[in-house]
């Protein structure tokens, strides 16, 4: 009897292990939220002023493109908007027990029809420079901005919500010294209160359903 229980337990554990190793089937239009492994002042500054799903401190986001059997991520990153192989995107994430801290959000059924148009808009941004100062209408783009713009409805109404940006530390309520240095370096006033987006806010959007975690 004990041997049967041990054998059954072993089979169960093996099944769980194999299930965990099975690749997730990404679809074009899936949105990948990433906690970046690079601990630069820029990444820390983003994490200090935004709130993410389950406090995961997302500092980056991109959109999946499945093309000719390969999986890419359309992303606005430094120095420009680009098409990145999925493997490279995952390797750039912080890891937990060897697994990347990346979460997959999938637009809910009512928004699925918006994906083909969104992908074409995202492709039109390829090669555009990264926006280090998070300003609208300057022909430069940051990661969540291209997704916000790509998923605008034809009538201009947004699927993802833009909110007044704040560069104040979540703990102190004061403007983060990291951001002060950042905007001084770019000789630009801090765009406090200007409408914008962030990976953290987008990860909590009601327009998507979290369908997978890589960690």
Identify the meaning behind each predicted range.
Residues 1-5:
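Positively charged n-region of N-terminal signal peptides that target proteins for export
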Residues 6, 10-19:
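Hydrophobic h-region of N-terminal signal peptides that target proteins for export
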Residues 16, 20-215:
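Cysteine-nucleophile amide-bond enzymes
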């Amino acid at each position: 009897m004990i041997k049967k229980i041990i054998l059954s337990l072993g089979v169960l554990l093996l099944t769980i292990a194999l299930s965990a190793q099975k690749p997730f089937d990404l679809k074009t239009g899936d949105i990948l939220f990433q906690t970046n492994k690079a601990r630069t002042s820029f990444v820390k500054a983003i994490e200090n002023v935004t709130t993410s799903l389950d406090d995961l401190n997302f500092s980056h986001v991109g959109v999946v493109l499945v093309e000719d059997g390969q999986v890419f991520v359309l992303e606005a990153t430094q120095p420009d908007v680009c098409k990145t192989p999925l493997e490279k995107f995952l390797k750039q994430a912080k890891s937990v027990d060897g697994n990347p801290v990346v979460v997959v959000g999938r637009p809910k059924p009512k928004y699925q029809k918006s994906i083909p148009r969104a992908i074409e808009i995202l492709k039109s941004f390829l090669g555009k420079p990264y926006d280090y100062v998070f300003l609208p209408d300057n022909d430069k783009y940051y990661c969540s901005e291209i997704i916000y713009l790509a998923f605008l409805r034809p009538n201009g109404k947004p699927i993802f919500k833009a909110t007044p940006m704040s560069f104040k530390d979540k703990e102190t309520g004061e403007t983060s010294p990291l951001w002060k240095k950042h905007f001084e370096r770019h000789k630009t006033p801090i765009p406090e209160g200007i409408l914008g987006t962030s990976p953290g806010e987008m990860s909590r959007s009601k327009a998507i359903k979290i369908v997978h975690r890589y960690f």
